[in-house]
């Protein structure tokens, strides 16, 4: 009964929000006569002067998300860049562990330089077969990922029964 009341309250809230979202566009923007435009706020349509002011840019023609961070990175020496991932972060780079390179995702121990293969993500023990991701105990059947004591093909188990 409580779930039914919660669903009814949420539906009523969605209905109220959708009704209140219908606003009239000013005459300045009335040149767009499509049926979907009254559902968008007038702030969604900017003049060209407003658009230029709204986008911060320090270099012409390009938009940098974190210009201060990029300037600091470019000013650093090669020695300082080696430990760059320890103190600072860059947008769009996902780092695990101490050091990270853009486009490289590392978990656990560092791979040996002799056997490091680009595009291979390793977890736990090293697998003999390329393209096989191994967790926990070794499986005798291909395509079976085993967790715990018993496992069935196609069943992934975590924790207790």
Curated annotation (Swiss-Prot):
Keywords: Amidation, Cleavage on pair of basic residues, Neuropeptide, Repeat, Secreted, Signal. Residues 1-21 form the signal peptide. Its main location: secreted. It comes from the Eukaryota. Residues 22-80, 111-113 form a propeptide. It is found in: Secreted. One of its GO terms (biological process) is neuropeptide signaling pathway. GO terms for cellular component: extracellular region. The modification Phenylalanine amide is found at residues 96, 107, 123, 135, 147, 158. The keyword Coiled coil does not apply. Belongs to the FARP (FMRFamide related peptide) family. This is FMRFamide-like neuropeptides. The lineage of its organism: Eukaryota, Metazoa, Ecdysozoa, Nematoda, Chromadorea.
